[in-house]
Amino acid sequence: YDTEPVREKGDTTIYSDVGAIMLGELIEKESGLPLDMFVDSLIFEPLGMSTTFYNPPEEKIKRVVPTEIDPKGNLIHGYVHDENAHSLGGVAGHAGLFSTAKDLAIFSQMMLNRGLYGWKRIFKQETVDLFTTRANLVSQSSRCLGWDSPSGASSGGIYLSDLSYGHGGYT
């Protein structure tokens, strides 16, 4: 595409799915595995996260909480509703995962332990630090590489610790 930037480099941060989508594509290219198989075998299975998946199988749909209503008034149940992820078959680097509170607690504990859960090392400490520290590519930006950090403008407002990080979104 041949388009001109709408802002000068370093001027502002605008959230976009494109970076995470490209990361998913890069993982597939470099690993030789589809993204869902890659994250399942290297992250979810070692952590025992048995109820986290892309495109939930029919037998697990009943465990998925409906989160949207389609234009006809039907609940969207176990179906990715992010348009970009949908166009990529429900498996993408930025959206499409379904999980449970238990599995999210496991993943969160691993992140709080800087990549370690039990005796299993999932990420290097330096990788977790890199992903959860403000990138400072733009002055006053709260963005980390893959996460967001507290700012007065965030949905958490003043209630989040300066050490917290997270990412809002939907499937």
Give the ranges of each region predicted by the language model.
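Short, small/polar residue-rich loop motifs at catalytic or cofactor-binding pockets
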Residues: G169-T171
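Short, surface-exposed loop or secondary-structure junction motifs
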Residues: Y1-G166
